[in-house]
Amino acid sequence: MLPNRKPPRPSPSFQSLNNNNQRFPLRRSLKIAQAHSLPTVPSEDAKDDDLITPELSTDFDFREIQHRYLMALQNEQDGETTSTDDAFFELDDDDDLSSPSVPGSPVDPPSISVPLPPKSAPPCPTQPAPLTNGDLYPTILSNGTPIPNGRITPALSTVSVSLIHEARLQQSLSTPCNGSEEEMHNGQVRKESEYRRFKSEGSTAGASLPAAEKTHMDELSPVDQRSTSGTARFLIQQDSVVNPSTKMSNTEQVAMMHTLKTKLSKYQAMMDKAFEEIAKVEDANIIEGCTIVRKLMRKVWNTPKVSADLANALCDYLRDRDYFDKLIKMFISPNTAACDQVRMECGKVLEECTSSANLEYIVNKSYTKKIMIVAMKLNKTPDQQRLSLSLIGNLFKHSNAVSLSLIETDVIDHIILTFKRAPECPDILRHAALALANILLYTCFEGKKKIIQKKIPEWLFFLASQADDVTRYYACIAVCTIVSVKEFEPLVRKSDTMKLVEPFLQVHDPATFARDYHKYAQGNTKEWLERLLPMLQPSRRREARSVAAFHFTLEATIKKEQNKLDVFQEIGAIQALKEVASSPDEVAAKFASEALTVIGEEVPYKLAQQVPGWTCADVQYWVKKIGFEEYVEKFAKQMVDGDLLLQLTENDLKHDVGMISGLHRKRFLRELQTLKVAADYSSVDESNLDNFLMGLSPELSVYTYQMLTNGVNRSLLSSLTDEMMQNACGITNPIHRLKLTQAFETAKHPDDVEVAMLSKQIDVFISYRRSTGNQLASLIKVLLQLRGYRVFIDVDKLYAGKFDSSLLKNIQAAKHFILVLTPNSLDRLLNDDNCEDWVHKELKCAFEHQKNIIPIFDTAFEFPTKEDQIPNDIRMITKYNGVKWVHDYQDACMAKVVRFITGELNRTTPTTKEMPSISRKTTQQRWQTTNTVSRTGPSRSIGGPRMEPPTPTFTPTGSQERATSTRRKIQPSASTTSDRN
């Protein structure tokens, strides 16, 4: 007799198939064994709930049972009843049976009258043998591989046992028969238990109800959810373009539909009960009912595979039963104002239930602006502000006309004001980025123009600099949506936000990124993807193509789980992705190739970004790709490679290639110039000449290769004459020659020229510690740019090998140096006598070049207790005046920063009168030395040289307006990245 031990957990390879429903209770196992005359192996003290598997005979074949199951389903659809021999498929776990047969009784193979299944049916193992742990494993696999002594190796265990469980899964997916009254009652008890759990968790109104049984909700479902983790669920398991497995098996599709049908019926009943509670009108009952619906919808959005279909079906059910309309009326009703919690709970349900169909209902019923007005009034608490932004973002996902009508209100100002005053609330910042992304995707040219006037590109820089990945991601999508419009590209470039896009994409995996937000983890709608599709066009900026390709890879991973990959063919994304995948854009091509692999499409030929190394075949492919297929043979005949392609002139195209049409030549040269700017010359450019020309003006990069082939490097630039530029370097445009000439007027050394050019682009350099000061530094940058200052902040990567000099040149070029001091920002420079820390290097450079240093102190910052730990060359910073930053009074803080910049407050070098009165122990002690404040009328005059925290009554002088009016127009500010953590 075998010991009564439970079998081990199945291997992960078939865990998603058996769904934990493949083990049978004792009674069911015995009845199945009796129905097929199979011997059983009961344990000595077996109980009803013990898990045990019947021992199968040598001639037993699971393919036969699988085929019988399919025949039973067909008969059921045709109105026929199955025979009693098919009891294997009709039994429930709760069926009561008599005592089992004796284990040693003779066994006859089951007689099956139906024909055998086709050869395409999955192979099944035979001759299982019991092991010491109570499991049954086959001694001979279907391929004839023998297993000595009935033992199975780990390598074979997954294959063989998964086949058994797959067969059992198909058995469990048959349409359930009408059970007995007792069974129906048991099912009702299960639903009641789950309903009570929703009602009791996290709600005070239902505290008097009996507590629900402590059972995980997944255990109450007829078909359990997959037990794989969220991370594993989104991993791309396909890294080859050969026969990609993009389609679900029939078993998985049946399981998915069964799960959807079962859960939908159960959740609809729970919705009805929740709204019965809401119908009682009392505030406590309304809150209780809304809490149940909200938690239910939150669970639905987290359901694997079927979440989108299940959620949309429940949203339709709410609308069809007038529940959705009732929620809207309670949310916008003036009577609800008496109880903010009722309005909040109604709003949270609307947040989860605003599907495309329900949004159409809102628009048709003219509820849009009413909901918008009420949502904008939710601004008292962080939870209200989060809900406000979430509802606003959902309302924009309808059409251009609706979006434009909403933009004409103060909604953009409301969004900016909400997240501007909550920089330390990740949820608010996340929903702000989501709202702006939806607004920009669902609005027309006129709407985008109005948004640009609100300085949204600058604010997107702040959102794209946050620690939360979802916030950064949707901020990148939003800014790329704006820059896709050619007319807005110059304005967006000035904000520096575009420089944050590709560095973010390069360190993230689209396959695992979607899980970070429950509602967006199941993908966006077809209409949303259609609006993103134009960003893949070759005429768009490189960053826009990269973020679009990233998102389509993310969506492909999700849609594959949902078996909805056809949507990409329907919207025409396949061809667009193939074009991007074959382009020289490294980041965009990488993600486009991944998307095509997941979808199951062939990845096209990939061109390298190192154009000088292209072969003749590469050039011919590129010529065909840009639309000049009729000239491919001419390029092949002339054996044009990457080197010759970069040196082609209009005369070469006309006489050697035979491109007679002048318009054809112009269009070809336009594509060639774009290629020259995007090309990577690092293999032939040792002096970083291309980087220098790009820093002066991106359009000068088209001359890089011809200058390199003629032996020009950075050290020779100052010696070039106008004639040499025109003849040797090929700079035929006189304006371009003038730009280079002006760059060398103030200095002859290339480094001095670079500083001189940077001084025309930078007013303020911001130094900060990335680990703690990133958010505050990015906020200060945006606020300064809005006041007309050109700001440098090190957020982008510098070229390898030139990091030190390039960063310090920006400090030399700037007139003002802002040091953002946040908690622990000086810890890494303590006792740094070798000047290895980057904040130390930056501050030392600012002192050496006598910059106007302005410290900005976070409220939690404190100077080190021992002053001698700070290196001597920067120790003077402890005696500098500065601004204490308080987020509630940002305008007052920034006004004081402007006064430091304009010189109205004392300059950076401390006076001898100030030094004796300075105590250097902590910032808090320094602030305790308050100054005398005299009030005259509504204004304040602040005396004394020490720092004072800004207050709501602080009134800045008119210097800000005077300074802004005299400043030059905002210019794009350079940026870089350093190891500042």
UniProtKB/Swiss-Prot annotation:
Record: active site:
842
Family statement drawn from the similarity comment of this UniProt entry: Belongs to the SARM1 family.
Is Hydrolase included in the keywords of this UniProt record?
yes
Per UniProt, residues of the SAM domain are 614-678, 684-750
Q: Per its record, how is this protein called by name?
A: NAD(+) hydrolase tir-1
Q: Where is this region: Disordered?
A: 1-31, 74-128, 173-225, 908-981
Q: Which gene encodes it?
A: tir-1
The record's comment about this protein's domains reads:
The SAM domains mediate the localization to postsynaptic regions of neurons.
- GO MF, any single term: small GTPase binding
